[in-house]
Amino acid sequence: MSTKRKNTGGKKNRAKSRKVEYDDEDISSEHNSEVDDAEAGSNADGEDAAEDALTDVSDMPELPAPEGGWGKPGTLLMCGLTNWEMAGRKAPPKGIKANVGRSLWTPHTFKNLNNARVRLIASGPAASHSIIITEDNRCLVFGKNDKGQLGVGDSKRRDEPTEVEALKGHTVIGASCGRNHTLFLTSRGIVFAAGDNKLGQCGVGKSDACIVTATKVKYSGPPIVKVGCGAEFSMILDIKGGLYSFGCPEYGALGHNTDGKYFITNTKMAFHYEKVPKRIVLYVERTKDGHVTPLDRVEITDFSCGHYHTVAIDSKSRAFSWGFGGVGRLGHNEQRDELVPRLIKFLEPPSRGVRAVHCGSTYSIAINVHGFALMFGQTKRTGEANMYPKPIQDLSGWEIRCVGCSQTSVVVAADDSVIAWGASPTFGELGFGEMRKSSTTPMEVKALEGLYITAVTCGLSHTLMICRDDTEEERAKINKLQVYSV
């Protein structure tokens, strides 16, 4: 990789197969909210209260749009695996053809959009489906849909972008994809969910196994400004800095000081999961000798979810992490799981404060207030892991604009270039081409040289990007790229 520096300057701990049953009943009072519903903005005790959630949103005010609006429109580019059922698998599931969809080894334009410009893209490191929002506010979805995660009313796979009818009339300003579920955020601060709900990850207050039509999450607190999905849990952030979680609590992923396990019998274990959003009320600092101090007045401003962990930033540029601690992905120089958000001492302000965080499946990337990227966890399937945040030296001197994190791959838009890396096996999500499919060190994506990427998101084995197309010169370069059509 060409350097652009300033002159002054083990193996994933896989979760064992869970031989547990998921109980629909709320049987333990220890999981009740530590604050009342008015403060938490949640209906923590179940479906009856959830029914009181707002249904008519027409009178709700719009959230203030950022300068420039809800995302700058551009041309959608895509690379990676398009056989969605094969993502993360060596063999196709029973009844699924192995050759439906191919790998796009370099970035392609998407013919089926019919030249529609796109202002928002979303996927997730565990997801084999994607969300795209067009300039004229259509919410389009495509990819795997076996649990109804596309929200289109059925469970049929979509290769061609399909509009979500349930969201017509809404302006979608944010979205996130879990393994088999999806969250949509509208401009009025309302959250809709679809997909697998076996563990409550859709937050609709019901125990339905699948939610095939986009349905409003049972929440009635302050407007929501951001949504995020782990593999089997969800996070939403309100306008006042309150963070709420729901879904599977395994490894402490929900941040409620529990992993949700309980015994039904001497040999039978189950999980208590959260079916509606519940506020995270405790943030702590732990010293080297194990002393724990609660922190007051924490207002979260941003967050990112990995498969089973979350990293969040507060208004003081402090970073907190919790959930599964394997291979150092939480940045605390140890592998213990954290059941509540814990301050990352290695990223403490003022000299080391954080302005952005991005989580992959088993790793995290923080961009500090000086613009340097630091990684903790493990992007490779083997080898040494970063137990605490360490600078990514190959990105030193680049002005990082946006980051996409996949299972083991990372794609970064910086200055007028795109930089990517990821260990084998890869399926084209890095965009290097068929001759060199992977790289364990950051490399520039030559196919995008001279193009300005404004947004990046990564799925399990694919990457979406929005490319600026304001000038004739930029459009001419885009037209030279290969075209993907279904």
What is the predicted function of each stretch?
Residues 2-486:
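Eukaryote-biased RCC1-like beta-propeller repeat architecture
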